[in-house]
Amino acid sequence: TVYQLQETNPGASVIYRDLAETPPAHLDGVLLAALRPQEGYVAPESLRAELALTEAMLSEFLAADVVVIGAPMYNFSVPTQLKAWIDRIAQAGRTFRYTAQGPEGLAGGKKVVIVSSRGGMYAGTAYEGAMDHQEAFLRAVMGFFGITDITVIRAEGIAMGADARALALDKALNQTKECA
């Protein structure tokens, strides 16, 4: 998907962030307090690198015109590294805000492409609503941020044998060409 987007937009700059290779730390009470400081709070030196990483990830996300999220399904949901990234960019006043009418997304105007891999089949099946907490979660979060242009490319059934895997990957590859 990224390569097709670069071919159609040769001047585009790409920031590649491999969350499996360099996963952000998961939120805990100490980090959450530093991300949402009260008046007079001074972050401890030990958190400065985490806060800088958070700002880098958030700035990258906000500056992007297109965000491509590679999201394998792990036990019906997203990998914890992806959840940790989402926790870092979900910032009141930056990606969303609360109003008297309810939450309002502040990160609209961009396109999000979710490239999903799944060992089984979920889309369009009885399992979709009950067991697919991956795609629904990602759509909900991006929608909460105000993003409405969301495309999902699925490679489903990749653990269901060699033929099913080849078919799933071929179908997903064709979808990426249409997406660019």
Provide a role label for each language-model segment.
Residues 1-71, 78-80, 84-87, 91, ...:
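N-terminal beta1-alpha1-beta2 submodule of the flavodoxin-like/Rossmannoid cofactor-binding fold
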Residues 11-13, 109, 147-149:
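A generic structural signal for alpha->beta connector loops
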Residues 15-17, 113-115, 151-153:
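Hydrophobic/aromatic beta-strand patches that form the interior of the parallel beta-sheet core
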Residues 21, 119, 157:
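Short, glycine/serine-rich, charged loops/turns that create anion-binding
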Residues 23-26, 76-78, 122-124, 160-162:
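Short catalytic/ligand-binding loop motif for oxyanion handling, primarily in non-cytosolic enzymes
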Residues 48-136:
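Helix-loop-strand module that forms the ligand-binding subsite of alpha/beta enzymes
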Residues 124-180:
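Glycine-rich phosphate/pyrophosphate-binding loop and the adjoining helix
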